[in-house]
């Protein structure tokens, strides 16, 4: 089957944030809340999953919140602090964190990503992002100088549905003008990325640096798809 398009998850796939807990701890400390970065780091995925349970994937968590994305993230920060027995953060602390993670300096682009994306574009593939993110994502990708690699962005807060719901994948496919069987999705979550993509008829590859997936890094993708060793730097 001819491959015409590749779509990508964002967090833990295109981007990483190895200092996530420390960034939270630094901001909270400026607002009078002392908490260990390692405790925040451990709590964040638990809170993300907990808050996901309050909304069906057919209803994006950011749109689902009465006060939108900022309201969701304020709730997120408050719940994270509660989980680590820290004081309740102010609205100013939550706002500073919200603004910080819209900046390029808060993130790292995964090694090999830029070269890999350029390689796929040279081969004539259409590219898209499919991500459970809020409306800040397009600007963030611009600031990271990644946006120009992509033909379209399917973002849950704009589409109104989260992965693994079919609607977010179908939105990307429609924008790309590509049938599901001619598209591949790459992401780190078996449920959201692999099962979600396959559920609409796309191919899917699981990214796992630990080695229990299909790819250890995005730099391996061109060789996996085309059987060559072209440098993706």
Segments from the language model and where they lie:
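N-terminal helical cap/lid subdomain that shapes the substrate entry/recognition surface
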Residues: 1-114, 122-123
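Asp-based, Mg2+/Mn2+-dependent phosphohydrolase catalytic module
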Residues: 1-6, 38, 87-93, 108, ...
């Amino acid at each position: 089957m001819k491959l015409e398009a590749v779509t990508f998850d964002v967090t833990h796939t295109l981007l990483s944030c190895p200092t996530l807990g420390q960034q939270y701890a630094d901001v909270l400390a400026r607002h009078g809340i002392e908490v260990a970065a390692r405790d925040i780091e451990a709590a964040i995925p638990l809170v993300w999953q907990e808050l996901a349970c309050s909304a069906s994937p057919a209803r994006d968590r950011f749109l689902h919140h009465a006060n939108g994305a900022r309201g969701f993230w304020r709730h997120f920060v408050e719940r994270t602090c509660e989980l680590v027995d820290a004081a309740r953060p102010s609205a100013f602390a939550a706002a500073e964190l919200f603004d910080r993670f819209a900046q390029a300096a808060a993130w790292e682009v995964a090694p090999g990503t830029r070269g890999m994306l350029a390689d796929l574009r040279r081969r004539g593939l259409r590219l898209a992002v499919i991500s459970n993110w809020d409306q800040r994502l397009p600007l963030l990708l611009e600031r990271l100088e990644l946006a120009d690699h992509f033909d379209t962005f399917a973002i849950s807060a704009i589409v109104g549905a989260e992965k693994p719901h079919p609607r977010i994948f179908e939105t990307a496919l429609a924008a790309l003008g590509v049938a599901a069987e001619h598209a591949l999705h790459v992401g780190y979550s078996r449920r959201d990325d692999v099962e979600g993509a396959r559920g609409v008829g796309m191919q899917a590859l699981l990214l796992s640096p630990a080695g229990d997936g299909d790819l250890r890094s995005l730099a391996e993708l061109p060789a996996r798809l085309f059987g060559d060793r072209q440098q993706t730097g």
